[in-house]
Amino acid sequence: MCADSAGWVPILEADCLNTKLKDMNVDYLFKAVLSLETMEECYSFFEDLCTVPELKALSQRLEVAKMLSEGCVYSDIVSKTGASTATISRVNRSLNYGSDGYKVVFERVKG
């Protein structure tokens, strides 16, 4: 990991994160998320930041990733989450070829 010269939160090396994504605004967003201390603070922040459909889409992707990592098949994931097969495929690609972000979260978050 490395930090930029402006003192922003540590950022991942270029081989771990798409360089088109990495900038000061994204760093500030991540720093803001890392500053939240309670579930209530998270709800308040994300309610202000995102529309309901945006937040539902993010949470759906996380649920899809969890189900894929547990070995669920696409048809079961579609039935339970309502996600499209395109979304499931995209998440599956991230699980298999991504930066292991989902893996880190699943190891740290239980339930």
Task: Indicate where each model-derived feature is located.
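Major-groove recognition helix of helix-turn-helix-like DNA-binding domains
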Residues: 64, 88-95
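General marker for long, soluble alpha-helical cores
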Residues: 75, 103, 108-111
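General nucleic-acid-binding
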Residues: 1-36
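Short, amphipathic alpha-helical "recognition" segments used to contact nucleic acids or chromatin
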Residues: 58-72
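Short, Lys/Arg-enriched anionic-surface-contact patches
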Residues: 41-60, 110
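Residues at alpha-helix boundaries and the short loops/turns that link adjacent helices
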Residues: 36-40, 52, 71
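Short alpha-helical "recognition helix" segments of helix-turn-helix
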Residues: 76-81, 88
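Short, solvent-exposed alpha-helical "recognition" segments
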Residues: 93-106
